[in-house]
Amino acid sequence: MNRIYACPVADVPEGEALRIDTSPVIALFNVGGEFYAINDRCSHGNASMSEGYLEDDATVECPLHAASFCLKTGKALCLPATDPLTTYPVHVEGSDIFIDLPEAQP
């Protein structure tokens, strides 16, 4: 895994999301003080998940077609999406957030 610096904790208030412009682009969410990172592109359509609707139960709804995903597992919870989103491990160290990304393939 390749650990990257994402942002300060203060940049992602509770109940909010932040787009992290990495490769791949990541959507970082704060749900009740727990941070979750997923691929920012909906698996059904070309929509930014960081612009989606965050629910208290750690799910996010795509802003384009209302597909819902579990932030913990990436699982698609309702149609029209059937494919999961990639999730990434998140680490909080002091006041900073880091995300583990897979190593780049040669």
Curated annotation (Swiss-Prot):
A biological process from GO: 3-phenylpropionate catabolic process
The cofactor note from the UniProt entry for this protein is: Binds 1 [2Fe-2S] cluster per subunit.
Which domain of life does the protein's organism represent?
Answer: Bacteria
Q: Which cofactor does it need?
A: [2Fe-2S] cluster
Question: What pathway, per the record?
Answer: Aromatic compound metabolism; 3-phenylpropanoate degradation
Q: What InterPro entries does the record tag this protein with?
A: HcaC (IPR023739), Rieske_2Fe-2S (IPR017941), Rieske_2Fe-2S_sf (IPR036922), Ring-hydroxylating_fd (IPR053387)
State whether it acts alone or in a complex, and with which partners, per the record. Answer: This dioxygenase system consists of four proteins: the two subunits of the hydroxylase component (HcaE and HcaF), a ferredoxin (HcaC) and a ferredoxin reductase (HcaD).
Family that this chain belongs to: Belongs to the bacterial ring-hydroxylating dioxygenase ferredoxin component family.
Official protein name in the record: 3-phenylpropionate/cinnamic acid dioxygenase ferredoxin subunit
